[in-house]
Amino acid sequence: MTMRSKFSIDRVLHDTAFAKWCQKEESRNADSITLYTSILDFESKLKTGSPSLSLLKLARHIHRKYVSLNTGTCHVIGDSIRTKISTRVHEVLDGKPPYIDLFDPLKQPLFQHLRSMHTEFSTTTADVNTTWEDASSTSSSNKGATIWFNEDAIDKSSRHEIGQSTVTHESEDDRFSFFNAVCTRLNSLQETKNSSETEEHAESPRKEKSSTPYGTDGFAPPPRSTQTNTLKVSNLPKRFESLYKKKRQQVATSDSSGFGSNASDFWSFERYGKSNQGTLERPNRLFTGTNNGFSTLQPKRRGSEAPKMTVELRYENDVPMVAKISANHAQSVTLRYFRHLFGLHYTDNCRFFFKSTCEDGSAQYQWTLLFHDDDILPVFQNRITAICRMCPPPEDHDLI
């Protein structure tokens, strides 16, 4: 690969806008960017002498997430190349030392795909910029247009009329004159509105003063009903009955003839909010049935519970531990969530194996070893099954 190509791929890998653009459509395969970055990270760690265990974890992660024909997501690479890389990674996991060109067959197809996508991205961005520049130039060409201010279209009945005039904004004095004209016009409109409101308020008291409580027939309207404020004391519990018997109706004194007597009875009912035994009573429904305000609240109905999925963990020579989780999240359970669910701490001498479908079809299932917290746990027969094996801390010379 030439220096020019290397410079181009580095620029593409660090282009944030390009990465977001690739994520908008699945056909652009945004995982190809992450895969190329992971390959460069593997080569960098190998050159700096990182521990073999760390290199094995990274190689297995690259193979499982991006390259494998069963679980890989980078579909822009041909099946033959992916099969070749799978063979190489399995050889390294079986004991062969990691080498610098382990993932070299992937670079060329990844580079071609990224270059093609970045060319399309650059063309799309250039079209948007051209459209924006055309719109900006059209907008700027209209800045010197003449504005015609016609006050007749606003209001011809105002006391202060500016008159039809031509207003320009080419100089500071013209803009200041236009500002003063607008302010004068707005002030006159506000004064007209305030004066009309003042006249309306001045006329309204005279109308209210001439009003009479008597109708057209010469009779006063009947007193308002106080039915909504009355309660039947006999229907209340005994512990609340005394609260309503302490105060009786207090009728204001007046002469027993004419309109004054009826008015005093009405205002006493309105003031105390209750009546004597002859007043219409409220229907007896406060303390019966489900509407009783002092009864126990009805329990809420439980909705249909979501289906559950079993998660099982077993240590060697020990009984299994089981947890239930929502089946809706079965395809997104990570190793981090699994350890948090059972309260586990990952150490170098602890290995988690998960039951999954056999990749080569030679057995009914296989035990898959997971390292990274972001790895998605496999679901086998509608459940997640794991075993934990303890082993002594590995040494670099034991893995080679």
From Swiss-Prot:
Residue ranges, compositional bias (Basic and acidic residues): 194-210
Gene3D superfamilies: 2.40.240.130
Coiled-coil regions, chain positions: none
Keyword Hydrolase carried by entry: no
Stretches assigned to the DIX domain: 305-392
Phenotype reported upon loss of the gene: Worms exhibit defects in excretory cell development and axonal migration.
Superkingdom: Eukaryota
Residue ranges, compositional bias (Polar residues): 287-298
Signal peptide: none
InterPro entries: DIX (IPR001158), DIX_dom_sf (IPR038207), RGS (IPR016137), RGS_sf (IPR036305), Ubiquitin-like_domsf (IPR029071)
Alphabetic keyword roster: Developmental protein, Wnt signaling pathway
Summary of the function given for this chain in its UniProt record: Works in parallel with pry-1 in negatively regulating bar-1 signaling in vulval precursor cells and Q neuroblasts. Shown to have a role in excretory cell development.
Quaternary structure and partners: Interacts with bar-1, dsh-2, gsk-3, and mig-5.
Listed name of the protein: Axin-like protein 1
